[in-house]
From Swiss-Prot:
Top class in the EC scheme: ligase
Molecular-function GO term, any one: ATP binding
The name this protein goes by in its record: Carbamoyl phosphate synthase small chain
Entries under HAMAP family matching the protein: CPSase_S_chain (MF_01209)
One Gene Ontology term from the biological process aspect of the record: glutamine metabolic process
Top-level division of the source organism's lineage: Bacteria
Pfam families reported for this sequence: CPSase_sm_chain, GATase
Its EC number(s): 6.3.5.5
Job of this protein: Small subunit of the glutamine-dependent carbamoyl phosphate synthetase (CPSase). CPSase catalyzes the formation of carbamoyl phosphate from the ammonia moiety of glutamine, carbonate, and phosphate donated by ATP, constituting the first step of 2 biosynthetic pathways, one leading to arginine and/or urea and the other to pyrimidine nucleotides. The small subunit (glutamine amidotransferase) binds and cleaves glutamine to supply the large subunit with the substrate ammonia.
Family of this protein: Belongs to the CarA family.
Residue ranges occupied by any Glutamine amidotransferase type-1 domain in the UniProt entry: 195-390
Catalytic activity from the UniProt record: hydrogencarbonate + L-glutamine + 2 ATP + H2O = carbamoyl phosphate + L-glutamate + 2 ADP + phosphate + 2 H(+)
């Protein structure tokens, strides 16, 4: 393995620290450590996004996951103060696996390097990996428990490292949204004239979501995961929103019950990603774990109501069971599977035929990613407008 001798101020020389990526099935990859040096454990998943690594790494939906980048070189644009998707700039990925770490930062907005930011936040990374071989393995065998071991930790017997990896908690059955949610309620005010107030449940919300609402004149009250429905009534919301987030939706029973209360109260509802799975469960649908998930910023999705195809940003390892255009009865009226992925037919959106509640599995807030699906926010505002007119507000 060739060694890059470029040095970042205050961090480890690139290529100087041996490291291993160890999978639970015993497969091991040799590389070099960067960022923090030590051990990290998580579920190994891959993203096909060619840009936006900062947005990916600060997305709370990646909590407890080691992210493998398929793009061959990472770090070119450094790190800046504007593109974080977590509220406090926290990196949520458990670790980062790459082929080549850029030796120089080349972006006018950069305030530091990827290497420096990871070291500062204690995030362990490994480079010099044959990521093509690794991604093929994950594609064929599925996402798997993994660990990155660098420095002194990499000197332990591989058999011992494999056992450490195997003994970590599984993603299936994990209720992780409470681990990434805000501790207290906070508010993002509307830009210009305030049209509506939305209560947004933070299950791992990305910061571009309230920005999308704010730009449309919507005041967003962001509440912690599992906040009782009775507690949000004080805000007199025009609508309720459920965000993206990590973990297994089958373990989120409290949030499912809350959404059922929202629907029973006939309050307009919109959900994305984890929120889509929660709405589906409230409708009586089942969820399952995908083999290797959808993670990227160019995933094609078909809207079976309009026939339109959107290119979407996605990050999910679980999905709802259903088929394109499927109609079914719920406690709240007839529902329909509105969207599916053109790559594999996975359910990407559901709605009540009345239009009062809808959700999508992908990320219309587009950070990073295309803006094809941003009209979903306009749709929610129009739904709240119509509801206000009906109620004579």
């Amino acid at each position: 393995m060739s060694k890059d001798t470029t040095t970042y101020q205050g961090v480890t020389e690139i290529g100087s620290v041996p490291a291993y990526l160890v999978l639970a099935d015993g497969r091991t990859f040799t590389g070099f450590g960067f960022g923090a040096i030590g051990t990290t454990l998580g579920e190994a998943v891959f993203t096909t996004a060619m840009t936006g690594y900062q947005e990916t790494m600060t997305d709370p939906s990646y909590h407890r996951q080691i992210v493998v980048a398929t793009a061959p070189q990472i770090g070119n644009t450094g790190w800046n103060d504007e593109d974080n998707e977590s509220r406090d700039g926290k990196i949520w990925v458990a670790g980062l696996v790459i082929r080549d770490l850029a030796a120089r930062v080349s972006n006018w907005r950069a305030t530091t390097s990827l290497q420096q930011e990871m070291a500062g936040q204690g995030i362990v990374g490994i480079g010099g990996i044959d990521t093509r071989a690794l991604v093929r393995h994950l594609r064929n065998e599925g996402s798997i428990a993994a660990g990155i071991f660098s420095g002194a930790d990499a000197q332990r017997p591989v058999e011992e490292l494999v056992e450490i990896v195997k003994n970590q908690p599984a993603m299936t059955g994990a209720n992780l949204s409470v681990e990434v949610s805000a501790d207290e309620t906070y508010v993002i005010e509307a830009e210009g004239e305030e049209r509506h107030t939305v209560v947004a449940y933070d299950l791992g919300i990305k910061q571009n979501t309230p920005r999308r609402f704010s730009a449309r004149g919507v005041r967003t009250v962001i509440v912690p995961a599992e906040t009782p429905f009775e507690d949000i009534k004080q805000y007199n919301p025009s609508g309720v929103f459920i965000s993206n987030g990590p973990g297994d939706p089958a373990a989120a029973d409290v949030m499912v019950d809350i959404v059922r209360e929202v629907l029973e109260a006939d309050i307009p509802f919109f959900g994305i990603c984890f929120g889509n799975q929660i709405l589906g469960r409230a409708f009586g649908m089942e969820t399952y774990k995908l083999k290797f998930g959808h993670r990227g910023i160019n995933v094609p999705v078909k809207n079976h109501i309009t026939g339109k195809i959107d290119i979407t940003a996605q990050n999910h390892g679980f999905a709802l069971k259903g088929e394109a255009g499927q109609e079914f009865e719920t406690d709240f009226g007839t529902a329909i599977v509105t969207h599916t992925c053109l790559n594999d037919g996975v359910v990407e959106g559901i709605a009540l035929k009345s239009g009062r509640a809808y959700s999508v599995q992908y990320h219309p807030e587009a950070a990073a990613g295309p803006n094809d699906a941003s009209p979903l926010f306009d749709q929610f505002v129009e739904l709240m407008d119509a509801d206000a007119q009906k109620k004579g507000a």
